Swiss-Prot record:
The keyword NADP does not apply. It holds the Pfam family PPR_2. Belongs to the PPR family. PCMP-A subfamily. The lineage of its organism: Eukaryota, Viridiplantae, Streptophyta, Embryophyta, Tracheophyta. GO terms for molecular function: RNA binding. One of its GO terms (biological process) is RNA modification. It comes from the Eukaryota. NCBIfam families: PPR. InterPro entries: Pentatricopeptide_rpt (IPR002885), PPR_At4g14850-like_plant (IPR046960), TPR-like_helical_dom_sf (IPR011990). PPR repeats lie at residues 70-104, 105-134, 135-165, 166-196, 197-227, 228-262, 263-297, 298-328, 330-364, 365-395, 397-431, 432-462, 463-497, 498-528. Keywords: Repeat. The gene is PCMP-A4. This is Pentatricopeptide repeat-containing protein At1g14470. It comes from Arabidopsis thaliana (Mouse-ear cress).
Length: 540
């Protein structure tokens, strides 16, 4: 094979769009020449394998065929294992090369350190001995490992050792403080930084958004002397993740007006923000804009679109995208499609899809259990929960238990409910406010108001929804006195009653024969609704 043809094949290999295409080109190189046995060419092919996520047996075969692998081909293999989340293989390769007296370089050391997880910090002494601590890329990974697996103070000690700090050193340290929730130190270090760059500003925006301080996040965003698309994405994500859809859309419109070109991540954030609204009209407008802008729809954008259509109950559009994705489907895609079916009450299609999934996680199980519970099939929800435990591929979490407790409540089966509570206790599953509300609902529906009240009193923070759960229970049982006491407590805590609150209170007064109290409560309502007037008709 001529050198020109060999170079051409190598260039074509780097442009291969699928693994079968790469396989064919590789076969040609093997048939006509022994070049793949050389480190340079093997390195290029392994890089293609990484990009196309080729099977590990195939990539390893290429690596093993190299007669004398140099540092470039070894680094390519490190990168492949890292991209494929094969941490153990990274460490095995490191051990093999070390035995041969070949140590990683500044490029591969970070991959090895990350793969070692919490043991990555043990590489610090070796890194310093080999002189790689001078490389910002290497020392930044060590600092990040301390933040993730030990403490931010340990990372700060490494930071303080650096005589000539780069911007990346400051940014890793500031980010570390945010990860540990230390806003004060993050702000202090940001102000100490000799020159704030785009990354440091973006880290601050992300940090404030993470602690739900969107006012300061926006202040830092507006103060930025120069913004990148990543900065815009950070602010957009802050709004979207905290439920401020309108603010996210306004900012996105500003972005377009100023001529900043959104990337795929931007579109995923904006689409996800619109998903919270579940507004078909907004969905149509966004899809039209995406078509006009000729957005490149990668698998992440398509998955976000699928989820948005599913939440708008447009199951046909969601299914069309699901089918288009083909082999690009991931767990998020499958779970979004299953949730779409459960949302419209089509549990048969949801179950069929679940049964054909190549791989499941806890979200997959939770989607089906919640679907059965919310669609009036409580017994099937419990049965499916038992299947989840039996299969053992996913461990039930807090979300699982909320649906299971709700199902027990609908069945008014306190004996089963007690078994579920015992399971929660034994498996140390912590319940949030939604979990406590489900527990209150379960006891209330089963008629055990004392236990429902006890759980309510255990809640660290109560909101109007928590109160309404208990109000509804008291109303159903006609306990007017306890209802009035609870209303007083609610107001003492500064929580404003809503429509549901007053309907439950008036219903309880009606059933308990508390005519005067009911009339007094009715007069205190600023804008009574039809439900409230209906309750008063019963009180006369």
């Amino acid at each position: 094979m001529s050198r020109e043809l060999t170079v051409s094949l190598a260039a074509i290999a780097s442009q291969a769009l699928t693994f079968p295409q790469l396989n064919q080109i590789h076969a040609q190189l093997i048939v006509f020449n022994s070049l793949p046995r050389q480190s340079y060419w093997a390195s290029r092919i392994i890089s293609c394998c990484t990009r196309l996520r080729a099977p590990s047996y195939y990539t390893r075969l290429i690596f093993d065929s190299v007669t004398f692998p140099n540092v470039f081909v070894v680094n390519s293999m490190f990168k492949y294992f890292s991209k494929m989340d094969m941490a153990n293989d990274v460490l095995r390769l490191y051990e093999q090369r070390s035995r041969c007296g070949i140590m990683p370089d500044a490029f591969s050391f970070p991959v090895v350190i990350k793969s070692a997880g919490r043991f990555g910090i043990l590489f610090q002494a070796l890194v310093e001995k080999l002189g790689f601590f001078k490389d910002p890329y290497v020392r930044n990974v060590i600092m990040d490992m301390y933040v993730k697996h030990e403490s931010v103070e340990s990372a700060r000690k490494v930071f303080d050792q650096i005589s000539q700090r780069k911007g990346s050193d400051w940014n890793v340290m500031i980010s570390g403080y945010w990860k540990w929730g230390n806003k004060e130190e993050a702000c202090k270090l940001f102000d100490m930084m000799p020159e704030n760059d785009v990354v440091s500003w973006t880290v601050m925006i992300t940090g404030f958004a993470k602690v739900k301080d969107l006012e300061n996040a926006r202040k830092y965003f507006d103060r930025m002397p120069e913004k990148s698309v990543v900065s815009w994405n950070a602010m957009l994500s802050g709004y979207a993740q905290n439920g401020f859809t309108e603010d996210a859309l306004r900012l996105f419109n500003d972005m377009l007006r100023l001529g900043v070109r959104p990337n795929e991540t931007t579109w995923v954030i904006v689409i996800s923000a619109c998903s919270f609204r579940a507004d078909p009209s907004l969905t149509r407008s966004l899809v039209k804009l995406i078509d006009e802008k000729r957005v490149r729809l990668n698998c992440f954008v398509k998955t976000a679109l699928l989820d948005m259509h599913a939440k708008c109950r447009d199951i046909q559009s969601a299914r069309r995208i699901f089918n288009e994705l083909g082999t690009q489907r991931n767990l998020v895609t499958w779970n979004a499609m299953i949730s779409g079916y459960t949302r419209i009450g089509d549990m048969s299609s949801a179950r069929q899809l679940f049964d054909t999934m190549p791989k499941r996680n806890v979200v997959s199980w939770n989607s089906l259990i919640a679907g059965y519970a919310h669609n009036g099939q409580a017994a099937l929800a419990i049965e499916f929960f038992e299947d989840m435990i039996d299969y053992g591929d996913s461990k039930p979490d807090e979300v699982t238990m909320i649906s299971v407790l709700s199902a027990c409540g609908h069945m008014a089966d306190l004996e089963l409910g007690d078994c579920i509570v015992d399971y929660i206790r034994k498996n140390q599953i912590k319940l949030n406010d939604s979990g406590y509300r489900s527990l209150i609902f379960m006891y209330a529906r089963g008629g055990n108001l004392w236990e429902a009240k006890r759980v309510f009193d255990e809640m660290k923070e109560r909101d109007v929804v928590s109160y309404n759960t208990l109000f509804t229970a008291f109303a159903a049982n006609g306990d007017g006195v306890e209802t009035l006491n609870l209303l007083s407590k609610m107001k003492d805590e500064g929580i404003e009653p809503d429509r549901v609150t007053y309907t439950s209170v008036l219903t309880a007064c009606n059933r308990a024969g508390l005519l005067k109290e009911g009339q007094r409560i009715f007069k205190s309502i600023r804008n009574p609704l039809a439900d409230h007037y209906a309750c008063m008709d019963l009180l006369r």
